Design a protein with these regions (language model features):
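One-carbon transfer enzymes
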Residues: 1-265, 269-304, 308-311, 317, ...
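Blade-level signature of beta-propeller repeat domains, shared across WD40, Kelch, NHL, RCC1
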Residues: 430, 434-444, 451-453, 460-503
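Residue-level marker for isolated small/hydroxyl-bearing positions within beta-strands
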Residues: 267-269, 319-321, 367-369, 424-426, ...
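Beta-rich, blade/repeat-based domains predominating
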Residues: 253-256, 305-310, 353-358, 410-415, ...
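Active-site cradle of extracellular carbohydrate-active enzymes
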Residues: 320-335, 341-384
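Blade-edge beta-strand/turn elements of extracellular beta-propeller
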Residues: 235-245, 289-297, 335-349, 384-406, ...
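Short glycine/acidic-enriched loop and turn motifs that connect beta-strands
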Residues: 271-275, 323-326, 371-375, 428-431, ...
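Loop/turn-rich, solvent-exposed surfaces of beta-rich toroidal or solenoidal domains
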Residues: 359-390, 403-440
Length: 511
């Protein structure tokens, strides 16, 4: 197979300069056919991109940077491509013999200007890949913005996820065209200079904030609830939430409660801001709340978070997120709660975050936020299945089954209510961890998947502070998390001995 990109030579960018495109682990050759510019770009765009590169990106090259030297190997069109990917807004060549003629569209329009217009209107666009041979929409997705710093960073993010979708289509595997949770947001469109100026101002403000405060600073909320909980009400109403105290220079996130052999513990990510690396810790809960101190239970040389727990064949297992290590590892509890041994590697050679498992119709299904090395971290859902927890695990026929920043990334345990399977998902439409949604799974098999978001949850009077990105329950105990402003001076002051309750276990008010 040969793939041909059609791009405007006057606006050649680094993301276009590639010899291959990775498709299902194979490097498929890419050739580029340069075309004349169909539409002029906003005045001074490349100068603004260069300013962002120097200030926002600290001089690091990015995918939206202009190519200074056009590679000779791409100057001529060989005419042998099997798949054409036309990134311009020019009319399709009616005599093109390629079996697929793919046209990315951004909020319904083609070309880089359409992507820029969406960004300048206040949001990343919905991406659709259209086969111009018959007009069919072959895939649809909405990228997340974790790496979208500035106008150039946003454009790079959009094109990275566009290539993800192109690779999935070119693989020949069936695609699931999702109905996205939300359309792209729009505001009054700013000019590029104003957009960049605002981005630089925001970046400076964030740097000042990070000098004064730990950012982000996550904390855990808990409550005992004898009645209908979040899953039944679709909101955060009910008994008030209490914040699990922390020492200030650590944050706690991703709470997973479990009762094992008569004792209940909440496991969570414990990140020391001074080190910048997470471990897994736990704290016991009694009938009235936390008991004793936080106990470290699992540490590796790499960052750990999201300690998903599952009981299987009489054993307790943990799958902490270890995406920086490039695998999905399974740990066995050999002494509860504080001794765990690595037992197996379920998946290797991939970047998969927040692995979460459910069982359905005799199979195990593992969901995770998948990333192919570029673009956002929270928009792509991959599913794997197996007959046994230890595997072997096989990929879903349509991976990634969904690209949607508002409903892809897992946010806690699956639940079954009245025979229906549900999962909490992160809603990152307004930024990473900004909110939660409750999604009902309508179809799930090795070849099908469909979910519908039924409820959305945001921080507010019932959960003050900022952000909300995990939901779990064990018996009466419900847990969530969020973030707050945490000044570094307060964290320093809290290290001195005092007569008050230990900050690790004392309840406090979310703020």
């Amino acid at each position: 197979m040969i793939i041909e990109f059609r791009c405007e030579i006057e606006h050649a960018r680094r993301w276009m300069d590639r010899r291959t495109l990775s498709i299902d682990g194979r490097d498929v050759p890419v050739q580029i056919a340069w075309t004349a510019t169909a539409e002029p770009r906003p005045s001074g765009l490349d100068m603004l991109f260069e300013l962002e590169r120097l200030v926002l990106h600290k001089g690091k090259a990015g995918g939206a940077d202009k190519l200074k030297i056009i590679p000779e190997r791409t100057q001529t069109r060989a005419g042998t491509a099997d798949v054409i990917v036309d990134f311009t807004s020019a009319a399709r060549d009616p005599n093109c013999p390629a079996r697929l003629y793919l046209r990315p569209r951004f909020n319904g329009a083609a070309g880089e200007n359409a992507a820029l217009a969406a960004i300048l209107a206040g949001d990343l666009p919905v991406i659709e890949i259209v086969n111009e041979v018959d007009g069919a929409v072959l895939d649809r997705g909405h990228p997340s913005s974790e790496i979208a710093a500035g106008l150039s960073g946003a454009l790079e993010t959009i094109m990275a996820r566009t290539l993800t979708m192109v690779a999935a289509i070119a693989s020949g595997r069936p695609r699931i065209v999702p109905q996205l949770a939300y359309p792209a947001a729009t505001t009054s469109q700013r000019g590029p200079a104003g957009y960049v100026a605002r981005g630089l101002a925001v970046s400076i403000a964030k740097e000042i904030y990070r000098l004064c405060c730990y950012a982000p600073h996550w904390h855990i909320g808990w409550r005992f609830n004898d009645n209908a909980g979040v899953w039944q009400t679709g909101d955060l109403s009910g008994p008030g939430w209490t914040v699990l105290g922390d020492p200030g220079n650590h944050f706690y996130a991703d709470p997973f409660p479990v009762t094992w052999r008569g004792r209940t513990f909440v496991f969570f990510e414990d990140l020391d801001h001074r080190v910048g690396k997470g471990i897994i810790s736990a704290i016991e809960f009694g009938d009235t709340g936390p008991i004793g101190e936080v106990v470290p239970v699992l540490e590796e040389p790499w960052h750990l978070s999201y300690p998903f727990l599952i009981e299987d064949n009489g054993e307790l297992w943990m799958i902490p997120e270890s995406s920086l290590a490039g695998d999905v590892a399974l740990y066995k509890c050999v002494r509860f709660p504080d001794k765990w041994e690595r037992h197996a590697t379920l998946l290797a050679g991939l970047e998969l975050a927040d692995a979460t498992i459910t069982q359905r119709n005799g199979l195990y299904y593992l969901f995770g936020a998948w990333r192919d090395g570029s673009g956002g971290y929270s928009d792509s859902l991959a599913i794997y299945y197996a007959e046994h927890l230890l595997g072997p695990w096989l990929p879903h026929a349509s991976n990634p089954v969904m690209i949607d920043r508002a409903s892809a990334r897992p946010a806690g345990n699956f639940v079954t209510i009245d025979g229906k399977l549900w999962r909490p998902v992160q809603d990152c439409a307004e930024g990473y961890g900004a909110g939660l949604a409750l999604a009902e799974i309508i179809e799930l098999s090795p070849t099908t998947f469909k979910q519908i978001v039924r409820h959305s949850l945001k921080p507010g009077p019932l959960w003050p502070g900022r952000k909300l990105h995990t939901l779990n329950r064990c018996g009466r105990l419900e847990v969530i998390d969020g973030s707050r402003v945490q000044p570094k001076t307060r964290a320093f002051a809290r290290q001195f001995p005092s007569a008050i309750l230990s900050p690790r276990t004392s309840p406090s008010t979310a703020g």
